[in-house]
């Protein structure tokens, strides 16, 4: 199904093409200025109701340890609680299923809250936490090994207490345990199901898994024995997988879904004009970027990678691809972030002449071709076309292979190594050490070429997690970011804003800096 269809029918009432075009035309003169972060009204939440959501991508996996797509999180959070959580305003770690303490810099003690059970009825106790942390560190299929690389051993010291012995101090570990590494799966289910747990997940979150039809629908329902009473109000959530974002918004306008998230700014006027919809916006760490496989021919030359960065017109990209509503990305942290390094902001001005000179020095003055992974939705295709035009002006021809997010991402980061470049995004993490560790650690999943750039970079990755003092850490990140950008290990493009269209009958939504919806506090009137 695509935008050319005369009607949209996702098991509900159709919205005629004429009605849709009237909405578009009526919104044509609407202001496109993005507002400040906003949240939906917080009335007294009512229990009940099934929330229907337009999901942006098919999950790569429903096992937190084996998945690899940033778009998975919004599904995973329904079925899994995390040992540590983050506050919505600043992503600061706060206790979740467990609290933590550091008796000394190389020891973390986790104290698990009582009464937590998995969806199969088994207890989420110290043994379960040890199983999960060891699984994440050692399982062959785990994609979170880099997150847990500081852990030397995990020991059960009480029914609800675990001692984590560290190989080196790690101040980022609480934030790490608020992400995939802190999502606890049932040991009983994981052992019994093996690889099938990817599709039949058993967690301890507010909702339990019901069904998943690839590229169609994911359904979860309330877990009646959920350990908290102040959240998880919905009876269930149904995700319709609609990768074309404009089509997803149509489904909400037509009343077939209650919510569409991750929308492009170009659709804001339609949301503003539509009846009974709220627009929720907010800043994010979501960085559109070009991933580079450093092991590929030509891209193993720093001059070629630098040429790509000089060839990019980021200001134009934000204007055209994001309707002017975004922030130019000169590194992988936005200007408002505490670890942002302003000295690097002008490292790669738009300079096609410089790009061509670097390619000439690299022996590629007559031009060359690269294969690029790209997604099939309209906005991804448009972003690819913009980049294709910009790089083409300096003699770099891009040949695209397109597919779904899980398919293309897996082919780039997994064993196939199918493309030279990937136009995608880094969706952000609660702590910047996670971002840089997951992308540039020698064996990290998102280091597509599995290349060790330099011993200094690897040392800085460890140092970035060694201190709790933000000023000390900022100095480390300054050095780390300088290596990343001077070596042109990535080509950042822009930071996006969160744009969600939510029906007015839905209450309690809170934006977050990751720009990914969590549903724990949502209720329906």
Which stretches of residues belong to each language-model region?
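N-terminal secretory signal peptides
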Residues: 1-19, 26-33
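N-terminal lobe/hinge region of extracytoplasmic solute-binding protein
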Residues: 54-105, 134, 200-202
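Gly/Pro-rich hinge or "lid" segments in bacterial periplasmic/extracellular proteins
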Residues: 87-89, 178-232, 236, 353, ...
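Surface-exposed binding/hinge segments that line
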Residues: 111, 146-189, 211
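Ligand-site clamp/hinge motif
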Residues: 224-270, 397
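Extracytoplasmic/peripheral linker and loop segments enriched in polar/acidic and small residues
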Residues: 303, 379, 397-410, 435-504, ...
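Structural transition elements
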Residues: 327-361, 379-382
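Long beta-strand-rich cores associated with HINT superfamily self-processing modules
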Residues: 500-525
């Amino acid at each position: 199904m695509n935008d050319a269809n005369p009607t949209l029918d996702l098991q509900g009432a159709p919205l005629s093409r004429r009605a849709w075009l009237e909405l578009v035309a009526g919104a044509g003169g609407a202001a496109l200025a993005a507002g400040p972060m906003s949240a939906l009204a917080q009335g007294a939440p009512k229990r009940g109701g099934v929330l229907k959501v337009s999901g942006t991508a098919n999950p790569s996996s429903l096992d937190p340890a084996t998945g690899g797509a940033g778009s998975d999180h919004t599904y995973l959070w329904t079925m899994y609680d995390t040992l540590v959580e983050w506050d919505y305003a600043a992503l600061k770690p706060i206790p979740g299923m467990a609290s933590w303490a550091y008796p000394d810099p190389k020891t973390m003690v986790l104290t698990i809250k009582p009464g937590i059970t998995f969806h199969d009825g088994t207890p989420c106790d110290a043994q379960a936490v040890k199983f999960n942390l060891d699984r994440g560190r050692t399982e062959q299929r785990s994609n979170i090994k880099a997150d847990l690389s500081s852990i030397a051993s995990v020991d059960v010291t009480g029914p609800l207490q675990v001692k984590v012995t560290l190989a080196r101090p790690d101040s980022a570990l609480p934030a790490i345990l608020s992400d995939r590494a802190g999502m606890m799966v049932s040991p009983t289910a994981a052992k019994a199901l093996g690889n099938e747990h990817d599709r039949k997940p058993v967690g301890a979150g507010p909702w339990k898994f019901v069904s998943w039809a690839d590229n169609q629908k994911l359904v979860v329902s309330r877990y009646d024995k959920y350990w908290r009473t102040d959240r998880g109000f919905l009876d269930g959530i149904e995700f319709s997988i609609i990768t074309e974002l404009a089509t997803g918004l149509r489904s909400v306008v037509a009343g077939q879904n209650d919510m569409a998230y991750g929308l492009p700014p170009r659709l804001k006027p339609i949301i503003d004009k539509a009846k009974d919809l709220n627009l929720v916006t907010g800043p994010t760490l979501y960085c559109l970027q070009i991933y580079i496989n450093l092991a590929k021919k030509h891209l193993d030359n720093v001059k070629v990678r630098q040429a790509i960065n000089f060839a990019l017109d980021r200001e134009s990209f934000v204007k055209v691809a994001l309707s002017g509503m975004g922030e130019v990305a000169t590194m992988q942290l936005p200007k408002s972030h505490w670890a942002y390094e302003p000295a690097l902001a002008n490292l790669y001005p738009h300079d096609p002449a410089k790009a061509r000179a670097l390619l000439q020095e690299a022996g590629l003055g007559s031009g060359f071709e690269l294969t690029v992974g790209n997604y099939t939705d309209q906005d991804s295709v448009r972003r690819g076309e913009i980049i294709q035009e910009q790089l083409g002006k300096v003699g770099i021809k891009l040949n695209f292979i397109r597919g779904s997010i899980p398919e293309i991402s897996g082919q780039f980061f997994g064993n196939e190594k199918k493309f030279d470049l990937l136009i995608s995004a880094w969706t952000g993490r609660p702590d910047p050490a996670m971002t840089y560790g997951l992308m540039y650690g020698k064996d990290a999943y998102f280091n597509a070429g599995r290349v060790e750039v330099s011993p200094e970079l690897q040392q800085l990755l460890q140092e970035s997690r060694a201190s709790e003092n933000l000023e000390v850490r900022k100095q480390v990140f300054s050095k780390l970011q300088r290596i990343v950008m001077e070596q042109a290990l990535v080509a950042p493009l822009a930071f996006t804003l969160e744009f969600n269209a939510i029906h007015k009958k839905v209450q309690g939504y809170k934006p977050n800096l990751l720009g990914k919806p969590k549903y724990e506090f949502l209720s329906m009137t």
